[in-house]
Amino acid sequence: GGSSRPPRKRDYRIANLNADVAALIDASGAREVTLLAHDWGALIAWNFAINRVRPLARLVIMNVPHPHCARRELKTWRQLRKSWYMFFFQLPRLPELLLGRNNAAPIGRIFRDSAVNKHRFTRAEAEPYRAAAAQPGALTAMFNYYRALFQTPDARQTGDGMVHVPTLVIWGEQDVAIDIHCLDGMENFVPD
């Protein structure tokens, strides 16, 4: 939550985010890179690997489907019901207003309520997420990831979608936002 928060939607285009990942890899001086990612980071990592922005030794993804599979499943009612929030986040200012009220208290509740084992994710554990969301510009930055995904074309530029590095996908079967059917057919794009 302490990173910069570029204010413009276009700052969250996949090409810019890929450039950020590439800069981190370059700055690390690493000769072999395993890219490990979850949630929004995983969407970026899929795109990074597909477009071969930098060589990777391995890719590890947690609970985000391959982009081609995700696009297919977003056409089903089953996944649309789970992904309603992505469409809500497209609205200007309203998501910030509703989720930012009471010092971003709804964010803490969302983190707790979406946990499978709610008793294992206490208020204290959700507090850093709420506090980060309450910072000036944080909610707009969070929603701009979704806004750029839907409103800029580069996120959909994944060519044939092939991933040419060994890939491990770890999946929690009770994910509240992404249906497990999103994994169907992934082997067509990830041969290893």
What does each model-identified segment do?
Residues 2-36, 40-192:
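Flexible "cap/lid" subdomain of the alpha/beta-hydrolase fold that forms the substrate-access gate
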